[in-house]
Design a protein with these regions (language model features):
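Charge/polar-rich, low-complexity and marginally structured segments
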Residues: 82-204
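Short beta-strand-centered aromatic/proline hotspots
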Residues: 4-9, 31-32, 41-53
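Short, solvent-exposed secondary-structure boundary/capping segments
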Residues: 15-20, 54-67, 96
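Short, basic/aromatic beta-hairpin or loop at an interaction surface
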Residues: 1-17
Length: 204
């Protein structure tokens, strides 16, 4: 059974935020994640567009820990090693834009009838699951026209990941990049500058 990586702490129709169970262990930017839904057999897919770590206290901020009162200097990972209590006072969270769901065993790349409930489990997807989801590219449009997220960077990241997942398969990595590039070109045919910027980001 695949271990869950966190749980939903905020949920809307178009996005959800999860708290990671391990400090600094969020899935990477652009990762496809899966949240459990209330309906039997339904899961909701999201793409991670923001990762943040901060104080668990509302309105609180992390304190400087790199220098002790005795003048000892601590750097980077040493700080976490010297202060294991940081895992109790800090929390890593990640937000994902909803790009589809599974219902009755079928992947649907539009918004689910209900968002995943707060406190429900969130999982990373496998390479096989990512390949299956990205076979259809309807979600490209969702990303390109989403507001308040780094949509172009996010689209490029998921295209690169989906292509890498196909390395060693019959179609292969390059074939997917070509297919994805054509789809992006058709969606952005009237915005050459934006199109070329995305194509540069997915170039192998």
């Amino acid at each position: 059974v695949q271990p869950r990586i966190g749980e939903v702490i905020e949920s809307t129709t178009t996005a959800f935020t999860a708290g990671a169970y391990e400090l600094l262990a969020a899935p990477p930017f652009g990762a496809l994640v899966r949240a459990q839904a209330r309906a039997e057999g339904m899961v909701v897919y999201g793409l991670v567009y923001e990762i943040r770590t901060g104080s668990k206290e509302p309105g609180g901020r992390a304190l400087v820990r790199g220098r002790t009162y005795a003048g000892r200097e601590l750097y980077d990972a040493e700080i976490y090693h010297e202060h294991p209590d940081l895992a109790e006072v800090l929390q890593t969270e990640f937000s994902a834009i909803t790009v589809g769901f599974v219902e009755d065993g079928r992947i649907r790349q539009y918004l689910p009838p209900q968002p995943p409930p707060v406190h429900y489990s969130v999982y990373e997807t496998t390479g096989e699951e990512l390949m299956r989801f990205s076979e259809v590219t309807d979600f490209f449009r969702t990303l390109l026209f989403a507001s308040q997220i780094p949509s172009d960077e996010l689209l490029a990241a998921i295209i690169r990941s989906a292509a890498r997942a196909r390395a060693g398969t019959a179609g292969g990595e390059r074939a997917y990049l070509v297919q994805a590039g054509r789809e992006v070109a058709s969606l952005l045919k009237d915005d050459y500058d934006r199109l070329t910027a995305i194509l540069r980001r997915i170039r192998p």
